[in-house]
Amino acid sequence: LLSRRQRQMCIRDRWTLLALFTICIYSCKDDENVETETFDPSKPVVISDFTPKEGGAYQKLLIYGENFGTDASNVKVKIGGKEAIVINVKSTYVYCFVPSGAFSGEIEITVGEGENSVTTTASTAFSYEKKMVVGTLCGYRNNRDDQGWRDGPFDGPEGVKCCGFSDNGRLAFDPLNKDHLYICYDGHKAIQLIDLKNRMLSSPLNINTIPTNRIRSIAFNRKIEGYADEAEYMIVAIDYDGKGDESPSVYIIKRNADGTFDDRSDIQLIAAYKQCNGATIHPINGELYFNSYEKGQVFRLDLVDYFKTIKKGESWDPIVKNNPNTFKQLFTIADPSWEFQIFIHPTGKYAYFGVINNHYFMRSDYDEIKKEFITPYNFVGGYKQSGYKDDVGTEARMNNPCQGVFVKNPDYTGEEEYDFYFVDRLNFCVRKVTPEGIVSTYAGRGASTSLADGNQWGTDDGDLREVARFRDVSGLVYDDAKEIFYVHDQVGHTIRTISMEQEENTAGDENMPEDESTVESNE
């Protein structure tokens, strides 16, 4: 459903297109009249009007006036000091696109070159509206793709600034410090820390005690009265079957006294079965849910049982098969070999199960009496049907849906106040799902940039749908206080952002990341 603001923008765009169409018809009928007049440097260039009066980047803009000539290559348009792309020119109008970052809105047109050029400025400014755009926070990929992995600052020359990010990743904010963003990888053993305040990448957790480099998820505990403070522990799931059905699956890592996590932190095995794709914590009641790829099992563990055992000085038995009452198997979601992860609604009343290798999401509702999730049902996407299609429910198509996050929508009222955003890895984009199951594309697959090389994937920053492109995106989180998405772009080897565009010289603004565009080839 379109918001009131979106409907107004659609109506405005239609009037703009109608105006352009009318001018084009007039031009065709009267092509021997003033519309074919060439630029005369002895006469002034005049801007008499423009439409629409307001809009954002890549808005189509029609500027009326006199003495523009007919050669588009001879006309330069600047809006807010930024050069605009000129599409068409006739003597009495210029058709162009509003450039990104045209904050002041001042319209300036220069016709001609050198001494024969004439410049004029519109008497009123275009009202530029900021919009959400894609940026690049850190990381890069050079033309040889041999930059490797390097901890370090976000900024600086190649060989100094940080790089890596080249395995399938998952992101997680530290609940006690939103400037600390952790990332783990299916293929790289270290858990890395993206320090947003100090603009630095480090690898504090190399966790050499775990038997695999397949780290699938990061979560944090809720407060458990008498046992654990809020986010005192990090919960890490690994994908391993080297010990059959006694293979380590979920670890619990205690935060250091100084509030950090690193290789000094105490790490304990809390659950062992096999092939765990992820673990998550119920946001209200705090129980732990984890799964197995083997048969699509979902297990539940009340963390109080673990902490009681440890507090009494007893040994904890993490073997799932030995403790069926402690590790309760709730259900299997479908068939064997289902690679999936669980994303719980902030209210805890339901969860989406993202089935990565079978290209759809299921929904499971929460039994508040038993305090557990019930057998899920298909929600959006086609069961075992990969593809790309924005649609409703099971008619939508996706390809390798990965990490997702619930984001509050201020246009909604009542309990269903959240949309669900997820990265559609092999469709190279970020998608959105409404509570009703309407799937749409939010960012990526740039309409204009993809025309240049025929690819839906790329490294382009800018307008969400017109310009921005990703490649194999796998991680996604959202900072609701700053209203910023952070996206892990695996093949681009970068951390990307989706945030409201900012005027230049705001690098010191604590509310926004200082992005830099990544222009290296990602072929």
Predicted regions and their residues:
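Conserved beta-propeller blade signature
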Residues: 180-183, 227, 232-237, 287-291, ...
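Hydrophobic core register within WD40 beta-propeller blades
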Residues: 171-173, 218, 279, 340-344, ...
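Single conserved hydrophobic/aromatic residue that forms the stacking wall/gate
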Residues: 1-11
